[in-house]
From Swiss-Prot:
This is 2-hydroxyacyl-CoA lyase 1. Mg(2+) binds at D455, N482. Transmembrane segments: none annotated. Residues 401-486 are annotated as: Thiamine pyrophosphate binding. The gene is HACL1. One of its GO terms (cellular component) is intracellular membrane-bounded organelle. Widely expressed.
Amino acid sequence: MPDSNFAERSEEQVSGAKVIAQALKTQDVEYIFGIVGIPVTEIAIAAQQLGIKYIGMRNEQAACYAASAIGYLTSRPGVCLVVSGPGLIHALGGMANANMNCWPLLVIGGSSERNQETMGAFQEFPQVEACRLYTKFSARPSSIEAIPFVIEKAVRSSIYGRPGACYVDIPADFVNLQVNVNSIKYMERCMSPPISMAETSAVCTAASVIRNAKQPLLIIGKGAAYAHAEESIKKLVEQYKLPFLPTPMGKGVVPDNHPYCVGAARSRALQFADVIVLFGARLNWILHFGLPPRYQPDVKFIQVDICAEELGNNVKPAVTLLGNIHAVTKQLLEELDKTPWQYPPESKWWKTLREKMKSNEAASKELASKKSLPMNYYTVFYHVQEQLPRDCFVVSEGANTMDIGRTVLQNYLPRHRLDAGTFGTMGVGLGFAIAAAVVAKDRSPGQWIICVEGDSAFGFSGMEVETICRYNLPIILLVVNNNGIYQGFDTDTWKEMLKFQDATAVVPPMCLLPNSHYEQVMTAFGGKGYFVQTPEELQKSLRQSLADTTKPSLINIMIEPQATRKAQDFHWLTRSNM
């Protein structure tokens, strides 16, 4: 009898699709986002049969953005499943975005059959080669038996070192090809990345530099959020009374309403700090490269980062601390604890920062309190902030919508803000919101995702509203509508303009159709839609949306087409003639 059972087992067959699904399951993949078709449909079905959640999107780009956000939120890669050729090409933007943001992502793409290569096969394209520019690892398994090995390596590569995107190419003939089940050897779940620590001597030097600082500043980046360093960084801030500034996605590592947060005096803090400690924040365009006039010429930078190649970029640091940000921060705490010390909370530096914060907050409050209609950005965000649940996710994209919203909308929890990020990518918002929503439903039921979109940004992925309604996700979309990119025109000006020439000759490139009813996209799919023009309408619609947990909502918020942000001490990027 045992011999008979063995013979029976050895003849059992398994398809390539099921091998792929089981390999993903073994690596703790929880979510797949994608658009099915030839040749990947069977992979999605096999994954669902194993308990992996599949979220069907309306565009591969949005699917890839969503999968990458899963990597940031869970520290294990989300999977983006795409068809061959154009489907894979549509996902390249999401792969590049994940790499730029240092988020783990695994893209699985179908490809043409091996025996048709170079013959002009259906959607034939050099996919492995194309993806190498946008990934840490790009490969095609040599056989079905090699699939578990390649998938494990891709998952491991995506989370080890600096996280990033990886690609696995699956030939169409692999998907339904049957092999002996005993020929498949599944790899064990790859371990979480090893925790590395900084050199002891460098930690001692860093502690000394911090103690001797006259005007210190901590900058908390999204790398600190990804490293789950909130506990150690908050302790460092509170124990030593140090002012801190979060980068956009570093918001919430220490709550924005913390008394030592100097976000409202950002420019002043950067310009006059003499010692700056960077926790997972890169000296790229977001932090103005660390160069004058945004910084003092002799400012001392202490860089804390997981990636050695990042250390010393653009500016020579005083100290570099290479390692896991949470572990390195604990090392700093231990070293600082050896000699009792505290930065004086009544110092001249603290006084300067508090005065500037008070001045900037007053200017923003004055703009928010304006009663004139249409509303401006500050009025909108002031009323939104009043009702935001403290535990909600805030997803944001747009130009002024994102930049102004970042200064008004508060984050109190780490990894609860997602935006255009390092790559400044427009179109990420709805994909990110969908990813946050599926994670919230599984891990923190009852949490809302508030997705704040400029009207132009909404257009990139607006059809994902159907995805939101299909899965009935806890998302409230706020479309801040100024009829354009940066600025637009009102209806009367628009009509007057069209009297003279064809729209292609007279409509400015940044203008969109005025008073577009984006809320009707949501109602078309069964969600709730609101068109609001006054603070009272905004308050009421947001209150109703938050109270109704059975449906997603879209609130279309009309603002002054020429509205802009308050005057800045420095131009954000480059000067513009607009």
